[in-house]
C-alpha cells in the first residue's frame, strides 16, 4: 500500500505544470554544464572555449578591426569564440606563416591567457620554447616574416616554455563572443543577460501554463432524457 501511495504521489507531482517547468530548466542547465565539462575531456584542455578580447591577432581592413567587419578572414577578431584543443608541444606546427595559433599562460601572470601565433621554436636543455607574435602587432603584419625585434618579449626573448601552453586554436565562431564581452566589461551586463534568460523561460514555459489554468472549464453537455 505504501508503495502504491508513493507512486501515486510521484505521478501527481509529475503532472504538476510547475514541476515540469522546473525539470525542463534543470535539464537545460545540465546540458550546458555537460557540454562544457564534456568538451574539456574531448578537446583535452581545461580551456576548450575562449573569447577574443583584443585586436592583437586581427589585421585591420579599411581601418576596421572591431569583430563585425570581415568576420571570415584568416585572422582573429574581437568577439570571436575560439575552440581550443590540447596538444603535445612537439606536435605543434612551427612553420610560419602557416604555424599554429596557440593559447598560453602569460609568463609571470598565470591567470591571464594569451592567444598568439608561433613564429619560431628553439630547444633549451631538453625543453621547447616558442617565439610568438600577434598577427596584427608591429609593422610586419601576418603573413609577412617579422624580424626578431618584433617577437613577443616573453622571458627576455627566450620564448614561451612548453609548460605554459594550454592548446592550439582549431576553430572560431564570429560575433557570439560579444555577449561574453558585454557581461565582463559592463557592470550591468550579467544582470541583463540573466534577466533576458529568465524572461525567455517565463514566456516559453510559465506563461502558457498560466493561460491554460485560466481557461474556463467547459460545461458537460446534458444528455437527453435526464
Language model segments and positions:
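Loop/turn positions that initiate beta-strands
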Residues: 79, 98-100
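Protein maturation boundaries and topogenic segments
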Residues: 1-91, 172-226
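Extracytoplasmic/periplasmic, Sec-exported soluble proteins
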Residues: 68-74, 94, 106, 110, ...
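Extended, hydrophilic extramembrane loops/domains of integral membrane proteins
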Residues: 119-178
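Short beta-strand-centered aromatic/proline hotspots
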Residues: 52, 101, 114-120
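Short coil-to-beta-strand transition motifs
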Residues: 44-47, 106-117, 153-161
Amino acid at each position: 500500500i505504501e508503495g502504491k501511495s508513493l507512486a501515486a504521489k510521484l505521478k501527481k507531482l509529475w503532472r504538476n505544470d510547475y514541476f515540469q517547468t522546473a525539470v525542463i530548466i534543470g535539464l537545460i542547465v545540465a546540458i550546458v554544464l555537460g557540454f562544457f565539462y564534456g568538451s574539456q575531456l574531448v578537446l583535452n584542455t581545461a580551456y576548450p572555449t575562449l573569447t577574443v578580447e583584443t585586436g592583437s591577432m586581427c589585421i585591420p581592413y579599411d581601418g576596421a578591426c572591431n569583430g563585425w567587419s570581415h568576420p571570415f578572414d584568416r585572422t582573429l577578431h574581437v568577439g570571436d569564440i575560439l575552440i581550443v584543443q590540447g596538444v603535445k608541444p612537439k606536435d605543434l606546427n612551427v612553420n610560419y606563416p602557416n604555424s599554429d595559433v596557440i593559447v598560453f599562460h602569460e609568463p609571470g601572470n598565470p591567470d591571464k591567457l594569451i592567444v598568439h601565433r608561433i613564429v619560431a621554436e628553439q630547444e633549451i636543455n631538453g625543453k621547447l620554447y616558442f617565439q610568438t607574435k600577434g598577427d596584427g602587432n608591429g609593422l610586419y603584419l601576418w603573413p609577412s616574416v617579422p624580424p626578431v625585434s618584433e617577437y613577443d618579449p616573453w622571458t627576455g626573448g627566450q620564448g614561451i616554455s612548453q609548460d605554459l601552453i594550454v592548446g592550439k586554436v582549431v576553430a572560431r565562431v564570429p560575433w557570439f563572443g560579444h555577449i561574453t564581452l558585454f557581461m565582463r566589461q559592463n557592470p550591468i551586463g550579467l544582470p541583463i543577460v540573466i534577466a533576458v534568460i529568465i524572461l525567455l523561460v517565463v514566456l516559453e514555459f510559465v506563461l502558457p501554463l498560466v493561460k491554460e489554468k485560466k481557461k474556463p472549464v467547459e460545461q458537460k453537455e446534458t444528455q437527453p432524457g435526464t
